[in-house]
Amino acid sequence: MNTDALTTLIESSDLDGLVRFVDGLVTSRDWGGIEEMKDRCREAVERGKQVWGPAEYAEYRLALDAPADRAAAVLGDGKGRYGPGPLWEVAASRHSWCEMESLVSIPTLRAMIGHERAIRGDTVDPDSIDSHIVEIPPVLQPWEPIYPVAVYRADGVDFPEGDRVPLEWVDLPEAGRQVDDEGPADALLALVRPWWDESSGHADAVQVEGDALAAIRSIGPHRARITDVTLGEALAAMAWTGSSGGAYGSRRGTPVGRSLAWWVLATLLGYDEMPDDPSDLEEAAELRWVLWDPGDAVGGWALHLAVEDPQDGVAWAISAVDMA
């Protein structure tokens, strides 16, 4: 590593130059050099230099590209909060559970990485992580979908939504009579809480007497584009939503999104807490699940979902948007 060049870049607060410097060290696989550069930038920040961004970028590239031991060394609670995603998720996107298990001792990080790797196909022993942090098993159930996961790159990240079936226009019936919600509407809103807590989005959720279309009408539109979907497709959409921070909030990660989606199922089925047997939640496949949108230019981050319980004659709908 060229320490003289690094000194010049830091003292001149050349942010673009420091990012290119990190990229060069990654190309040469000089992990020790990246760690030194990160530490020197942190020291310079204490002297008033505005080089915290390149320091965070160095940590990001270590989590993304370095061997597992180097990646694990930069992890910590809250790390990556202001980046494209939490550093534990960045590291877990590139390193297997076998590589990471013995290197991560902080219970929160261990649980999140274990769940992320289980979602990505690794076998994770539930007894190897704290079950109180993510209160669902790190084992995909037969009724669950293949969840869309974040794809981290040197220059950014993609959050694929997965395949969505086409939507068709329908005229909506009269709005259903709104009734007091006993939990599901709050669980649906929890999927998107960072969109208004930390960002500039908004969301509405209702419970009504009637079917899914009556619930959608209660949100506001007279017409909507809709499609009926399977439980798996609805779970994938909810987990994708719950993992995000919206346009400007902090990303929570797919394990959080999956757990929040399970909680929606539990509340819809009348549970006050998560059932001991995960297979009990498969009963939610008997509900009618509808993805919809109001047909205008939604853009940004959006979730439009309706759920109908035909046996009890009630339905729920959520409309959430956070414009990028």
Regions found by a protein language model. Give the residues of each.
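Charged, amphipathic alpha-helical stretches
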Residues: 1-65
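Generic detector of well-ordered alpha-helical segments enriched in charged/polar residues
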Residues: 7, 19-23, 35-38, 42, ...
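Extended aliphatic helical segments
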Residues: 19-22, 26, 45, 51, ...
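Short, low-complexity intrinsically disordered segments
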Residues: 29, 50, 86, 95, ...
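Extended, low-hydrophobicity segments enriched in charged/polar residues
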Residues: 56-256
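C-terminal, beta-strand-rich globular interaction domains
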Residues: 217-324
